[in-house]
Amino acid sequence: METKAVVLTLAVLFLTGSQARHFWQQDEPQTSWSRVKDLVTVYLDALKDSSRDYVSQFEASALGKQLNLKILDNWDTLSSTFTKLQEQMRPIFQKLWEDLDKETSPLREVLNKDLEELKQKVQPYLDQFQKKWQEEVELFRQKMAPLGTELREGSRQKLQELQEKLGPLGEELRDSLRSHVDALRTQLAPYTEEMRQRLASRLEALKESNLAEYHTKASEHLSALRENAKPALEDFRQGLMPVLEGFQKSVLAALDEATKKLNSQ
């Protein structure tokens, strides 16, 4: 049953996105496109920073000095060209994502409704579990209070006695909490299975009715993406050409120099 619960959770999070997290926390949800855009921006910025470090280390090496590619001299040109590509591609990806987000909205609404019903059913058990957990911890603290006094006033011999007293208390707390966890798992099992069956039913209905339609629309979006991206990628290629030609000349010059040295030996 634990495995089923994990699979269920992952499936719900995958299909509903971060909306589930905002649902539980009652936060204002961030749009799907904003989440993707922020993630990609952070990733690309980190990639550019780390790439510059690698290039700097390479140029400082013996081979880098010998080749003298001067990549860092052209780094600003490369960065600006790459940034321009990002700016040109952003609206294309945004439209693609918004279209897909709109088309899958009905399914996500149904799943969020199922999740709302599940939350209402299991919330009393979660509240009860939290209450019992706090009671057990408070009881443990009360039992520990006199032992703390003994610890402050005790000798080495008393320390050993305290250790013997602490052992059963720790085991008692552990066993109590474990029993509460087991009870909670048992109480939630029917609802977990119910949600799993609902999810399977929703996916089966999607497969029978709209899967072919989604596949066709996804293919259309990808074809449109390729067509719309062609001008931006061509501009990117044109911007890279001077830099690549400079690299080529540097490599050829380094190879020519190495050949001359070998022939002169």
From Swiss-Prot:
Record's keyword annotation contains Phosphoprotein: yes
Methionine sulfoxide found at: 195, 241
Matching SUPFAM superfamilies: Apolipoprotein A-I
A molecular-function term among this protein's GO annotations: phospholipid binding
Entry keyword set: Cholesterol metabolism, Glycoprotein, HDL, Lipid metabolism, Lipid transport, Lipoprotein, Oxidation, Palmitate, Phosphoprotein, Repeat, Secreted, Signal, Steroid metabolism, Sterol metabolism, Transport
Residues spanning the signal sequence: 1-20
A single GO cellular-component term on record: extracellular vesicle
Modification after translation, per record: Glycosylated.
Sequence repeat ranges, renumbered to this chain: 69-90, 91-112, 113-123, 124-145, 146-167, 168-189, 190-209, 210-230, 231-241, 242-265
Tissue specificity remark: Major protein of plasma HDL, also found in chylomicrons.
Subunit structure, as described in the record: Homodimer. Interacts with APOA1BP and CLU. Component of a sperm activating protein complex (SPAP), consisting of APOA1, an immunoglobulin heavy chain, an immunoglobulin light chain and albumin. Interacts with NDRG1. Interacts with SCGB3A2. Interacts with NAXE and YJEFN3.
Family classification: Belongs to the apolipoprotein A1/A4/E family.
Function: Participates in the reverse transport of cholesterol from tissues to the liver for excretion by promoting cholesterol efflux from tissues and by acting as a cofactor for the lecithin cholesterol acyltransferase (LCAT). As part of the SPAP complex, activates spermatozoa motility.
Name of the protein described by the UniProt record: Apolipoprotein A-I
Source organism per UniProt: Orycteropus afer
Gene symbol of the encoding locus: APOA1
